[in-house]
């Protein structure tokens, strides 16, 4: 990621105002970090000569030893400066140097009268040093910063050992987490690549769940600054996560078990995404589901806080669902092609009566209009009307008429006493409330109730005589072709 992209993305997330709140314990190198940051990134990009000189004059002072140098909060520069990072891309930058949390061994936060009193921009009266550190940290991050930077150390930069910084370090991190702004941690060390430093970096990152970078602030380079910005960018919240399911899964009905499983997995997993940094971890979590072969990050828009994730299903799952949908096991490509041909033929036939079927279900009567291919045209015939002549064109086309008829089937077994009948009713109704359809599976005299009823309905359907069917067809033809609206039916 180039520096222009980093600044552009951060500017989008912060509204163009990149304000760093630099916090931490005393004697960790906060002022040195601000000074180096300004000299490397900000001051060289200030076009106005007077603004550049003013920013140079307002750089904080830093020195080695145990004596505290920053005794009051300081804005660097005092007024935010606008720098042009690239053509058409201007950002406002300002850093805030906070009063550090006190640590054992540091000098300068007490005088002969007790705790040293500090002047702050937030109170007219001076307040004690430790109070200025706590209030200043919260106010700087909450009101004057878009990004927080916690500076700590492994103890190699001065005379104060690492153990003396731990309590102050924990207080700062907890304070920042309460505020809720994105922040990162820098370990200021003279040995950034030493195994012990790397071990400390990893342990702090795991303990605080934030990005931790080990570097020598005194030897800060421009690439280090952009690394800090890049890591800070990943701490911004995710505003939108788009998860793309396999295309063939999206074809399934919303109520299908597999599609529901995917949707539940997405809902369960993406709820853990809060920061851009969480996206990679969530992508890995998706891969743990048995119905997801793999997941990949399709793209991430740092500036907009939008992530896009692609999910892929196992090939064997596709075969399983295909078998489930088609109803038969697919034995190979030839078998699949034959099934597709059969289904294609069936679909052509079904499409001709689909509207009629829908009508008959809704109203009890449906008509399937004939297709052009079904029409037969008789030979044109000359006709005469008085002194005038014309041509008679006659076409015949079959139309399919569907009538919904409710067929009743009654089953009345005579089994004995009234008590025995009551027991049969209880037996039939025992699971009816939980599963009404279960009554059809009830066993009556060695047969299921469904088979008995089905047999009764089938018997009634076959009772309609052949000549009655023909007469019914003939009657419909006359009504339609002759336009008769009246019908008298006599059933013998």
Curated annotation (Swiss-Prot):
Chief location bin: cytoplasm
Binding site for ATP: 24-31
Compartment annotation: Cytoplasm
E.C. designation(s): 3.6.1.-
SUPFAM superfamilies membership: P-loop containing nucleoside triphosphate hydrolases
Effect of disrupting the coding gene: Defective in formation of mature forespores. Fails to progress beyond very early stages of sporulation. Forespores lack the germ cell wall or cortex and the mother cells are filled with swirls of electron-dense material.
Entry GO CC: cytoplasm; endospore-forming forespore; spore wall
Main EC class the enzyme belongs to: hydrolase
InterPro entries the UniProt entry points to: P-loop_NTPase, SpoIVA_ATPase, SpoIVA_C, SpoIVA_middle, Spore_IV_A
Function, in words: ATPase. Has a role at an early stage in the morphogenesis of the spore coat outer layers. Directs the assembly of the coat and exosporium to an area around the forespore.
Protein name: Stage IV sporulation protein A
Source organism: Bacillus anthracis
Highest classification ranks of the organism: Bacteria, Bacillati, Bacillota, Bacilli, Bacillales
Underlying gene: spoIVA
């Amino acid at each position: 990621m180039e520096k222009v992209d980093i600044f552009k993305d951060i500017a989008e997330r912060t509204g163009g105002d990149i304000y760093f709140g630099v916090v931490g314990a005393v004697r960790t190198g906060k002022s040195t970090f601000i000074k180096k940051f300004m000299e490397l990134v900000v001051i060289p990009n200030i076009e106005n000569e007077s603004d550049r000189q003013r920013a140079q004059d307002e750089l904080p002072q830093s020195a080695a030893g145990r004596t505290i140098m920053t005794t009051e909060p300081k804005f660097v520069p005092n007024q935010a400066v606008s720098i042009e990072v690239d053509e058409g891309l201007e950002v406002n930058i300002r850093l805030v140097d906070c009063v550090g949390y006190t640590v054992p061994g540091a000098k300068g936060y007490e005088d002969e009268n007790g705790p040293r009193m500090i002047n702050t921009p937030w109170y007219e009266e001076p307040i004690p040093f430790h109070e200025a550190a706590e209030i200043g940290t919260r106010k700087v991050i909450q009101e004057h910063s878009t990004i927080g930077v916690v500076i700590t150390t492994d103890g190699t930069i001065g005379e104060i050992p690492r153990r003396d910084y731990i309590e102050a370090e924990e207080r700062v991190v907890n304070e920042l987490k309460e505020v809720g702004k994105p922040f990162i941690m820098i370990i200021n060390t003279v040995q950034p690549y030493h195994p012990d430093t790397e071990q400390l970096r990893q342990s702090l990152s795991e303990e605080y769940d934030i990005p931790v970078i080990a570097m020598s602030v005194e030897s800060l380079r421009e690439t280090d600054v952009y690394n800090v910005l890049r890591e800070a960018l990943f701490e911004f919240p995710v505003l939108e996560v788009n998860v793309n399911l396999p295309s063939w899964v999206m074809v399934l009905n919303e109520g299908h078990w597999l599609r529901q499983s995917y949707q539940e997995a997405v809902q369960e997993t993406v709820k853990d995404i809060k920061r851009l940094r969480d996206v990679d971890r969530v992508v890995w979590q998706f891969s743990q589901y048995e119905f997801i072969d793999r997941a990949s990050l399709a793209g991430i828009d740092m500036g907009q806080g939008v992530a896009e994730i692609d999910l892929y299903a196992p090939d064997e799952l596709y075969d399983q669902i295909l078998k489930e949908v088609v109803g038969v096991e697919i034995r190979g490509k030839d078998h699949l092609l034959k099934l597709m041909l059969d289904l294609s033929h069936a679909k052509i036939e079904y499409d001709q009566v689909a509207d009629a079927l829908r009508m008959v279900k809704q109203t009890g009567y449906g008509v399937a209009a004939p297709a052009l291919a079904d029409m037969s045209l008789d030979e044109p015939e000359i006709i005469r009307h008085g002194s005038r002549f014309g041509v008679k064109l006659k076409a015949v086309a079959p139309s399919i008429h569907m009538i919904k008829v409710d067929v009743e089937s009654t089953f009345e077994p005579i089994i004995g006493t009234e008590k025995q009948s009551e027991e049969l009713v209880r037996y039939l109704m025992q699971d009816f409330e939980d599963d009404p359809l279960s009554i059809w599976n009830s066993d009556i005299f060695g047969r299921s109730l469904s088979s008995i009823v089905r047999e009764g309905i089938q018997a009634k359907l076959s009772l309609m005589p052949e000549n009655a069917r023909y007469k019914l067809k003939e009657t419909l033809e006359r009504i339609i072709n002759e336009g008769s609206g009246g019908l008298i039916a006599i059933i013998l």
